[in-house]
């Protein structure tokens, strides 16, 4: 299906609904998909009518669109798709009572066992969050390249570092802002912040600027 006219109310509502549980058009980081849709929207959506679209538009506006990764496609290639047909193999768990015989019962039992085996083999859902983290240095003399190396040196099971940038905060000081994806059951954000603040030569404090479930 994809996005339609993103300058119309219907198109903006479609975008707003699509972004209800997403931070970006595709994946966990900004890409050319966001750049294409951003250009198609043209102007910032009304915050009152389209809060999700407005949030996304404001965030993408902070990036240099030409540098975002990926390959640009037509705007209709992005967005909601038709509901996929269920891929579950359907089996008849309820046979007719009219033709009960040992062979039919054996086949039915095999089908039930196979069905239960498939259900048990399905992997459990992994809950993830997309987090934008602000890392604040001590002053304008803090070496930000070394600060970034220190941040990215932290490795945890269930933690994936993403894109980062420097954001001016005044008086020549920049804060380091970075996106990350965490598996909720494996990574404690509080523990991560404590570890980051352990780099006392570079880091004054950390804050969670934004967070959304994936």
Swiss-Prot record:
Keywords: Elongation factor, Protein biosynthesis. The keyword Plastid does not apply. It comes from the Eukaryota. The keyword Protein biosynthesis applies. Pfam families: EF-1_beta_acid, EF1_GNE. One of its GO terms (cellular component) is eukaryotic translation elongation factor 1 complex. GO terms for molecular function: guanyl-nucleotide exchange factor activity; translation elongation factor activity. One of its GO terms (biological process) is cytoplasmic translational elongation. Belongs to the EF-1-beta/EF-1-delta family. EF-1-beta and EF-1-delta stimulate the exchange of GDP bound to EF-1-alpha to GTP. EF-1 is composed of 4 subunits: alpha, beta, delta, and gamma. This is Elongation factor 1-beta. It comes from Schizosaccharomyces pombe (strain 972 / ATCC 24843). The lineage of its organism: Eukaryota, Fungi, Dikarya, Ascomycota, Taphrinomycotina. The gene is tef5.
């Amino acid at each position: 299906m994809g996005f339609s006219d993103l300058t119309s109310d219907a198109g903006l509502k479609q975008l707003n609904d699509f972004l209800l549980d997403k931070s970006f058009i595709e994946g966990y980081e900004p890409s050319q998909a966001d750049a294409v849709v951003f250009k198609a929207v043209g102007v910032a959506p009304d915050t009152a009518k389209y809060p999700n679209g407005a949030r996304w538009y404001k965030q993408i506006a902070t990036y240099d669109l030409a540098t975002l990764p990926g390959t640009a496609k037509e705007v209709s290639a992005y967005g909601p798709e038709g509901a996929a047909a269920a891929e579950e193999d359907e089996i008849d768990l309820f046979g007719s009572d009219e033709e009960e015989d040992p062979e039919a019962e054996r086949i039915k039992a095999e089908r039930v066992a196979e069905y239960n085996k498939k259900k048990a083999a399905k992997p459990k859902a992994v809950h993830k969050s997309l987090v934008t983290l602000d890392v604040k240095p001590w002053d304008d003399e803090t070496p930000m390249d070394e600060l970034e190396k220190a941040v990215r040196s932290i490795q945890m099971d269930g933690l994936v570092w993403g894109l980062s940038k420097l954001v001016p905060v005044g008086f020549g000081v920049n804060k380091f802002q970075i996106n990350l994806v965490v598996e909720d059951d494996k990574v404690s954000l509080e523990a991560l912040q404590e570890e980051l603040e352990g780099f006392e030569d570079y880091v004054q404090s950390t804050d969670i600027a934004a967070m959304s479930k994936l």
